[in-house]
Amino acid sequence: DVGWEWAKTNELFFIYPGQKRMSEYTQTRIAKATQERKWNLVKRLSYLLTHSHSAKLLAVRIVTRNKGRRTPGVDGELWTSASEKMRAVLSLTDHQYRAQPLRRIYIPKPGKTTKRPISIPTMYDRAMQALYALALQPIAETTADTRSFGFRLYRCAQDASRYAYTCLRGKSSNSWILEGDIKGCFDNIAHEWLREHVPVLR
């Protein structure tokens, strides 16, 4: 029974988090291979991770426990029962995978009369994103600028403030802070460039 299997596995996440540890071990190996610039090894380890049962369990758990878990995509599907979650784990594959269209909704901007658009993927697409993020994160965090703090794992606004303070506290430090915003940044990301240059399963 797939529902019982999920319930048993889900319980193990709390009592014996072995599935998560297995994924984290492979992520550590990916980060080490990235540091050593062994890109073929990075690809092999990334393939192993994204095709492992433990990583698929973790990906489904991520998308069924976050804030958007009650918001469906264009297919109207949600994974709420144990059976649905385990079936999702067993069905996750990149074989002939094609992402479905995004569901577009508009939410109010805080303190403004205008609304901003949000694109909602299906649960399956979210799980695939979470699965591949597990492989991409150790690469990104190993190679990223150490002075970058936005949308980074284990980094927050307080870290950015602390770094700014360190840069400005000396007598000969810079005396100017420039604030800028890139208009439509995420709407204009060059996805083709990313596909060509990210060393994962090219």
Outline where the language-model segments fall.
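Non-catalytic terminal/accessory segments
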Residues: 1-202
